[in-house]
């Protein structure tokens, strides 16, 4: 989390995930080629991501993503309880013209389709499995926000509030004069599985 998958346009000198992976590869083989991007993750997301060792593999993997054949599974901790608790959601999205780098629902936008399934409900939050069928920017985050249960700690599509122990354990007291520290303050979203041909 906190590292871009690829170089950022506005800060091309900042280390990205490709640079870090390449540095690692070069410790074993100084002549190792630079990794190739197959897909991207949001900067605040941690989990499974694919890179290719050479251009031929990149082209083959990217074609699979264009054909929508990889099976992607995400798990997310969300605010509240999604309604309905399972199903498919199809909407249309576009980049938000007033907020660069974010998306919004728009009838004329690109199709965004996801399947979702409630795994566990808690008092104030839920654990949900999401299987995106398309590959839109912020797709899982938008899907959950559309269902009325944005991803925890999502500052763009949700409240952005961190998870506090006092939310779950009413008797919790951080101590006199101490401020309660969050149990989790980063985006509650993780890609957990990608199934593809390789």
Set out the residue ranges of the language-model regions.
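RNA pseudouridine synthases
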Residues: 1-198
